Amino acid sequence: MDLNTFKNFLIKRASHSKFKDEGITKEDITKIVDCARFTPSGHNQQPWKFVAVTDKKLINTLADKVISNLASLYPSLPEETVNMLEKYKFFLEHFRGAPLIILVFTTKNDYTTSEIKRDFNIKLAEPKHFDMELLGVGAVVNNILLACEAAGYVSCWLTEPVVYAQKEIEEYLKEYIEDNYNFVSLITVGR
């Protein structure tokens, strides 16, 4: 593939929030998630896990948790903020309409730059807001979005469900993911 072809492919990919009522085959889900294996990460840690959900009842339950947590904030907020959040609510729960959501989890950062400096007695910069695992998640999510596009699907990367219901979603899905992982992103996939 030449650079112009690749650039056009990148330009074609866009985020979508509305989906046709079409399912996604298990084979396509596996192929899309398999593309994540080839994502570079710091020290090749590949600090991510995925939970793919096609069950509409479960998708709706997760969306309900996000909206319920948002609504629980309303009594403590000024009316104009509540009105703004009500308009914004669609973006928090539009994943209800997706035939597939991929929840992205990453390991909890337990080895900081400070510890590396201490353990190896070397001078390193102490970058602000540096989290190797989250940088890797950004790369892996992008690969999944591009894989969706290549497979003929549309997708959207969401982080707001994390803001409003991270702990509740982690608790609800604890049988699928280890304790040392945090829910950090959600990807919707459909046609």
What are these regions (language model features)?
Residues 1-31, 46, 177-191:
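Specificity-determining recognition surfaces
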Residues 36, 102, 118-169:
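Small-aliphatic-rich amphipathic alpha-helix that forms the alpha element of a beta-alpha
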Residues 37-44:
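Glycine-rich phosphate/pyrophosphate-binding beta-alpha loops
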Residues 45-47, 95-100, 182:
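Short connector loops at helix/strand junctions that flank enzyme active sites
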Residues 52-137:
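Glycine/small-residue-rich phosphate/adenosyl-binding loop
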Residues 71-81, 171-191:
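A glycine-rich helix N-cap at a beta->alpha junction
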